[in-house]
Amino acid sequence: MPTIGIVAGEASGDLLGSHLIRALKKQRPDLKFVGIAGPKMIAEGAETLFPMERLSVRGYVEVLRHLPGLLKIRKEVAQYFLDHRPDVFIGIDAPDFNFTLERKLKHQGIPTVHYVSPSIWAWRRGKIKKIQQAVSHMLALFPFEPEIYRQAGVAVSYVGHPLADMLPMEPDMEGAREELKLPQDSLVVAMLPGSRQSEVQQLADLYIKTAKLILSERPDARFLVPLITRETRAIFERALYANEGYDLPVSIMFGHAHQAMEAANAVIVASGTATLEAALIKRPMIITYRMPNLSWQILKRMKYLPYVGLPNVLAGRFIVPELLQHDAVPDKLAATLLQMLSDKSQIADIQTEFRRMHELLRQNTEEKAARAVLSFIK
């Protein structure tokens, strides 16, 4: 039975991995998948050696704190694949974990595919040599990435983004509100503080205080907070009580981020894949992020681009506002959101750009990615 080694490190990678496994099994039902998988990949038949949550660490300080455990897991996973050699290994995102693992496997003659280029165009250009040593084939989600790899002599395929295939070109706000039993004429704000516990801890207080300020200006406002785990939900609920927000019209949802954003007039979102989902749902948004100050100082020194949010990177300009770190305060966040919603020409510009983006990224991603992987299997 042909075996594919596969490692994902967080929720967005789990989603990508689950769709890729499904596409591969359509063409080769005999394939076996083993590595580190999240719940969606496991549901598609992947076997996991460790819980994926163990890899979900972000920020330099946080990684240092968890480093011994991460190194131990990586060593054990590498040894497993050397003892049970897969036909090909796929690393999904998680570059700091996967590139070292991929380099070890590639040096032992195991082909390696990396799915999702790291942000070398933003702050990791020095990593291209490490990528050359580690990766047999790169699967790039964004159209500006392949040229960087071709110039460095790395085999690459532009596959587009699976979210662009999954999401309809025109969202249905009215239908989403009917399903969620929300008034059609209310202001609805979706708030997405991230998928990791550390992200939600950093942003929960900010989002709740911002919701209070928005409500003081717009008493008809409703707030939707989709969270994917019990742990992140508990963190947000504790923050609600700590900020005396128990009377706020906030609905905490288990997942259903797409539905929440479709029902919303606007989105407040942590920097990450959810910003792209909001763009593909054509929603005006404010991108936020907070991290421990030391991590922020290190990140600032490494950054090449003036923006961090994927919609702005793809647009090549600040199509939506970013309020990061010390700028991420309730007064600014509430005022910026209300001002944006009052400017119809700004919203029209945002939505036009997001439609263009959607068309560019819609590439039948799963099939293209599967084809590239299967080229390594006899």
Curated annotation (Swiss-Prot):
Catalytic reactions on record: a lipid X + a UDP-2-N,3-O-bis[(3R)-3-hydroxyacyl]-alpha-D-glucosamine = a lipid A disaccharide + UDP + H(+)
GO CC entries: membrane
- Example GO biological process term? lipid A biosynthetic process
The pathway this protein participates in, as annotated, is:
Bacterial outer membrane biogenesis; LPS lipid A biosynthesis
Please provide, alphabetically and separated by semicolons, the GO molecular function terms listed in this UniProt record.
lipid-A-disaccharide synthase activity; phospholipid binding
Q: Does the keyword Transcription apply?
A: no
Q: SUPFAM superfamilies from the entry? A: UDP-Glycosyltransferase/glycogen phosphorylase
UniProt superkingdom: Bacteria
Listed InterPro entries: Glyco_trans_19
Family matches, as Pfam families: LpxB
This entry's Enzyme Commission designation comes to 2.4.1.182
Question: Briefly, what is this protein's role?
Answer: Condensation of UDP-2,3-diacylglucosamine and 2,3-diacylglucosamine-1-phosphate to form lipid A disaccharide, a precursor of lipid A, a phosphorylated glycolipid that anchors the lipopolysaccharide to the outer membrane of the cell.
Q: Which family does it belong to?
A: Belongs to the LpxB family.
Q: What is this protein called?
A: Lipid-A-disaccharide synthase
Species whose genome carries this gene: Methylobacillus flagellatus (strain ATCC 51484 / DSM 6875 / VKM B-1610 / KT)
